[in-house]
């Protein structure tokens, strides 16, 4: 993900574009285990939707120069795992070598969107954490999230975007 791709996608119907990467893991406490997906986002991520659904704490602040351990979890995960704002949570990952490794994160906030499938799975974290866990460099991402303006023909926008992205990225 770089400025070249971002400029290719400079279209009047696009509201925002963000690099994102995911990493599957397990949240483990003394009494519970819960499968999650870390959704790594960067400092420019548009938090407006999540902010409007924030029920306690704050949105984490990330920057390009350092890796943050701050995360945002859902109320569903917090309730199931008996976690709260300012708690440390250990998330376990399986590497390519099939070895497990745990990382400790600090819960900065709790959200509740009402979208059960998302709330059951996603923990927002620093994109640099997911890059490190995946062994990626600073330009690598899992996908890009494209938000369209209201009242845009999604099918037409999809067709335009599809032909603007280089084939090696599709």
Residue ranges and their predicted role:
Residues 2-139:
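A structural signal for hydrophobic secondary-structure junctions
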Residues 38, 142-147:
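Short cationic amphipathic helices and targeting signals
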Residues 107, 144, 161:
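Conserved hydrophobic/aromatic pocket- or pore-lining residues that grip, position, or stack substrates
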């Amino acid at each position: 993900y770089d400025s070249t791709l971002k400029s290719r996608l400079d279209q009047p119907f696009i509201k925002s574009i963000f690099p994102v990467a995911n990493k599957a893991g397990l949240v483990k406490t003394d009494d519970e285990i819960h499968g999650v997906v870390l959704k790594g986002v960067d400092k420019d991520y548009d938090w407006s939707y999540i902010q409007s659904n924030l029920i306690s704490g704050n949105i984490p602040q990330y920057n390009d120069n350092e890796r943050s351990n701050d995360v945002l979890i859902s109320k569903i995960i917090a309730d199931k795992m008996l976690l709260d704002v300012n708690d440390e949570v250990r998330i376990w990952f399986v590497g390519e070598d099939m070895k497990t490794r745990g990382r400790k994160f600090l819960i900065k906030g709790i959200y509740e969107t009402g979208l059960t499938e998302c709330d059951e799975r996603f923990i927002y974290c620093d994109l640099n954490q997911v890059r490190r866990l995946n062994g990626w460099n600073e330009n690598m991402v899992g996908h890009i999230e494209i938000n369209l303006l209201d009242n845009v023909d999604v099918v037409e926008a999809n067709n335009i975007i599809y032909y603007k992205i280089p084939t090696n990225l599709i």
